[in-house]
Design a protein with these regions (language model features):
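Conserved G/P- and acidic residue-centered "switch" motifs that form tight phosphate/ATP-binding loops
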Residues: 124
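Rhodanese-like catalytic fold shared by cysteine-dependent sulfurtransferases
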Residues: 2-47, 54-55, 66-116, 127-191
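Structural scaffold elements adjacent to functional motifs in cytosolic proteins
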Residues: 60-62
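Short, surface-exposed ligand- or partner-binding patches at beta-edge/loop junctions that are enriched
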Residues: 120
Length: 191
């Protein structure tokens, strides 16, 4: 399993982040744990991330495609989408991540050290690889949101239409496979 920010913490509040409906919680958690293991990224759980977000001590890097982000996003998230080639390289040879030019890396280097940087995607795979890569590039810890925006939403985290900043009650799940894990059947996977 990947590293966790909360390892050794006797507060099992992240267990409440085991998200979804229809009895799929264990299945989703197993999948997310496998993503954590694959990427070797350091994890932060939704409740802890939400607390930092409320305190203004968190920057979310949304590593989903722009169309996913534009549908629903964690408030104030910045988009940095990996390319298909970058994802293929990093998942097969362990290096070579490439990004679409959504946000310059120089901008990320300006984030104060007392602010936690967290990558997020749908369920934690893309963002896990990006968190590991960005940790190296930025020479500082970059965490992965365990379970992605699905866990954030299921834990009661606010998601918004980033163009209007109005709260929405659905999450774009990239594909049909992940939609079933969003509480209340609020997963959308259209282009």
């Amino acid at each position: 399993m990947g590293n966790t920010q909360s390892e050794g913490n006797s507060d099992d509040s992240h267990d409440k982040d085991k998200n979804n409906n229809n009895g799929d919680e264990e299945e989703y958690e197993k999948m997310c744990n496998e993503y954590d293991r694959k990427t070797s990224s350091t994890q932060i759980y939704a409740k802890e991330a939400m607390k930092l977000h409320e305190e203004g001590k968190l920057v979310i890097i949304d590593t989903r495609e722009v169309y996913e982000h534009e549908y629903a996003a964690i408030p104030n998230a910045k988009v940095l989408s990996p390319t298909t080639l970058g994802m293929t390289l990093v998942s097969t040879v362990g290096t070579g991540m490439r990004y679409q030019q959504n946000i310059p890396l120089e901008e990320l280097k300006k984030i104060p050290e007392d602010v936690t940087i967290v990558c997020s995607c749908t369920a934690g795979l893309r963002s896990g690889y990006c968190a590991v890569d960005l940790s190296k590039r930025l020479q500082r810890p970059v965490l992965n949101l365990h379970g992605g925006i699905i866990s954030w939403f299921n834990a009661g985290g606010k998601v918004v239409n980033p163009k209007t900043n109005e709260q929405v009650d659905t999450v774009h799940t990239y594909g049909e496979n992940w939609a079933k894990y969003v509480k209340g059947g609020k997963g959308i996977f259209k282009l």
